[in-house]
Amino acid sequence: VATQARALRPGIKISAAVFPDGGESREGIAQDWRYWVSEGLLDSVCPMNYTPDRARLELDVRRQLAWTGTKAQVVPGLGPSVCSEELTPERLLWMLDDVRRLGAAGFALFELDHALLEEYLPLLAAGRAAPAR
């Protein structure tokens, strides 16, 4: 698909939302994103790191960055809607700081719902989620 898309539209950027691990997803869900990155098929990956645990997030993002190296950008997906009771807006801000400190290209939030609109996004709009300068 990537080869055909690039032939039709040179310069197109191709990304994929992927499961966070690099091995089990290959065997269990036929999602070998580490291979796709190594072959230059993806420009960026968005691992679905839906955890309220900052230590787990840091471990996962460090591994994902190591797996991709300079071949693709890593844009970690965080899931305030998935872990809403444990992943408070304040905790999410700390996790965004962690992701930035680790060198990720950005972040994505799953999924747009009332809580994200009313509780999380106002804090992000206040400036904590602004790109690093």
Short names for language-model regions:
Residues 41-58, 64, 70-133:
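Substrate-binding cleft of secreted/luminal carbohydrate-active enzymes
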Residues 32-33:
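Short, glycine/polar-rich helix-capping loops at beta-to-alpha or helix-loop-helix junctions
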Residues 4-8, 39, 48:
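Short hydrophobic alpha-helical module
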Residues 1-29, 73-82:
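Aromatic-lined carbohydrate-recognition surfaces of secreted/lumenal glycan-active proteins
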Residues 1-5, 68, 99:
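Hydrophobic, Leu/Ile/Phe/Ala-enriched alpha-helical segments that form helix-helix packing faces
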